């Protein structure tokens, strides 16, 4: 049985304090007034809160709202998750689109499911005319991402965490015009769950979120609580720090991009008297994710050390970063 439209709930969503926070998040991400957006809802507390708060914004014309949910079929409860989304959507008077995935078991299931979910969401967004897909990633998710990136030596860009907006990561035809927008990055997990309680909307619990045998699970349940015990509010402050890191990385990358020649190489003279951070950024941009952390830093040091001796630094796939007397360039793998 589908729930009836609940006008009192919609009014409560309009008046909830976090609705204004979501609106500011949309504005920061460049979502214009009246834009049609689709919330990616899983049935969990985070996306249910975003769905409800966006319904409040839609009620006074800030956005046009559609909800998309994907039954990935990996857990037996996933169909119930989608049903929960549909029930909440009916109470809010919001159209809910659903897709079911048919994934074979085997290696790489999590990655394949993530890719297929984005493809399904993109397909639904294109179907309903949405220009953005809204994800409910919040400040806690952001800090988890930043800490894992820091531990892996991901560079300034990685330490900045998730951007507020980016192209949707899939290859669905037409999806190149879709944006993935994260309006909740300055909000905590606790505040979004609290909004669900305040509004009286039902959500589903995903037991995999309680796992402590994965890198993200360890960071979520062990590392972040320890950080909060040392410095209360660390999660919220880290989200702002991530924004600063991303802005700093944009400045560095724009500088390096301006230094590159038509063939993609960079003159070493451009690094004369420049901080090593600029050389490190150049290595990150040239090598992308094809070089380990220690080699990246060795290459960055070689760029600025003044030596004219040619040196080569290996990259995955057989390519290499070449630091010669006068230039820095990537040499492709030889057959």
Residue ranges and their predicted role:
Residues 193-243, 247, 326, 332:
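Mid-to-C-terminal catalytic subdomains of enzymes
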Residues 2-221:
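Core alpha/beta nucleotide-donor-binding catalytic domains of modification enzymes
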Residues 2-46, 58, 66, 72, ...:
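AMP-forming adenylation/ATP pyrophosphatase catalytic core
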Residues 151, 228, 287, 291:
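Hydrophobic/aromatic-lined pockets within catalytic cores
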């Amino acid at each position: 049985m589908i729930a009836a439209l609940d006008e009192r709930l919609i009014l409560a969503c309009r008046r909830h304090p976090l609705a204004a926070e979501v609106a500011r998040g949309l504005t920061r991400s460049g979502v214009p007034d009246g834009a049609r957006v689709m919330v990616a809802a899983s049935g969990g507390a985070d996306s249910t809160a975003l769905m409800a708060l966006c319904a409040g914004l839609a009620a006074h014309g800030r956005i046009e709202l559609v909800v998309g949910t994907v039954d990935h079929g990996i857990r037996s409860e996933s169909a119930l998750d989608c049903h929960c989304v549909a029930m909440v959507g009916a109470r809010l008077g919001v159209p809910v689109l659903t897709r079911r995935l048919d994934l074979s078991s085997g290696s790489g299931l999590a990655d394949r499911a993530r890719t297929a979910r984005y493809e399904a969401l993109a397909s639904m967004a294109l179907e309903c005319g949405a220009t953005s897909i809204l994800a409910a990633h919040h400040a806690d998710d952001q800090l988890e991402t930043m800490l894992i990136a820091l531990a892996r030596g991901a560079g300034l860009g990685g330490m900045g965490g998730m951007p507020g907006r980016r192209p949707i990561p899939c290859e669905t035809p037409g999806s190149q015009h879709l944006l993935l927008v994260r309006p909740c990055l300055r909000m905590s997990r606790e505040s979004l769950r609290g909004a669900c309680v305040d509004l009286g909307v039902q959500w589903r619990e995903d037991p995999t979120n309680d796992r402590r045998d994965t890198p993200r699970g360890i960071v979520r349940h062990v590392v972040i609580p320890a950080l909060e015990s040392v410095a209360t509010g660390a999660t919220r402050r880290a989200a702002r720090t991530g924004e600063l890191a991303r802005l700093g990385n944009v400045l560095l990358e724009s500088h390096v991009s301006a230094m590159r020649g038509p063939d993609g190489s960079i003159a070493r003279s451009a690094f004369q008297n420049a901080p090593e951070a600029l050389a490190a950024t150049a290595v990150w941009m040239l090598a992308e994710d094809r070089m380990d952390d220690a080699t990246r830093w060795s290459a960055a040091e070689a760029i600025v050390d003044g030596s004219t001796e040619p040196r080569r630094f290996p990259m995955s796939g057989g390519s290499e970063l070449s630091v010669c007397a006068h230039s820095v360039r990537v040499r492709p793998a030889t057959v």
